[in-house]
Amino acid sequence: MSRVTIKDKTFETSIPEAEILKKVKQVADRINKDFEGKTPLFLAVLNGSFMYAADLMKHINIPCEISFVKLASYQGTTSTGTIKEVIGLNEDIRGREVIIVEDIVDTGATMKRMLETLGTREPAGLHICTLLLKPGKLTVPLDIEYAAIEIPNDFIVGYGLDYDQEGRNLRDIYTLVQE
């Protein structure tokens, strides 16, 4: 396993890129089947989901649209619990199937807030599509239809996920080494 140091923390490889890409394709295949005959709007949550969204879209072969919003609930390695919308949604989602593309569902607080916000715009359906899910850390009930990989309650970085804005460019996913 390789290690990387970001700022004052050391991380080691936990999910290699090849495994990530295999799981992303499996999720895309399910979405293609589930939304056949529909034109969903993929709503990617920046900054963390940019790599996942890009790789996912390469395998989506149904008609679709993609847009982006930006929410923040992290500072360093802990969730602040404060969620603010930085970039809003401009598309009319009334009557549309919306697939929220997220890098990770941790406590679920950010996703719950997002579902509440989007629900006021009367979509036909809201669907959660996350690269990573920490089932042991969920504090709110969520119907997560598409979770590519379940992980333990560790702090991770890479493949779009950051530690204080660094490490997003790493191809693999790394776990914080507890020393």
Model-predicted regions and their roles:
Residues 1-179:
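PRPP-associated nucleotide enzymes
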